[in-house]
Amino acid sequence: MDGKYYNLWSTDNARTDNNDDVVIKSVYDPSPVGYSLPASNAFTGFTTTGQNVGDGYTPFTPEQLAQLNINGNFNKGYYFYTKPNKSGKIFFFPASGWRYHNPGIMYEIIKRTHYWAAGPYNRNIGRNLVFSSFHIYCLDYSGRNAGFCVRSAEEK
């Protein structure tokens, strides 16, 4: 990563805030044809507040659990609802782990994971979802040189 570009995964997007702007797929987007990385706000429906929940180290409190738009408990991932207030269909996001750029090994398989979004945080850091049994951060950001999961969305 040379830190020169904001828009590696969304050609017309240099905004560094979380947003729902249309993603214009770039040649660097790892998604298959017809799909792209989702907008940076795509994962905000995973909590009722659209904000990060939990601290990543201690179990959820009853109040925090009420803020999660999930079906059941963490079981090597979460079943998230497609609509607000625990409604709609459910779909599974596995806790697949992640790969840090150095030394390039996998971490926290079935315990924690990250999923990339298209939006930048700055030139070196991208937006993503991260979760474990102790937190769901739908508005997270991490160095773009890490190997995270991709959950592509159909292009608009």
Task: Specify the residue positions occupied by each region the protein language model found.
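C-terminal, surface-exposed recognition/capping segments
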Residues: 2-156
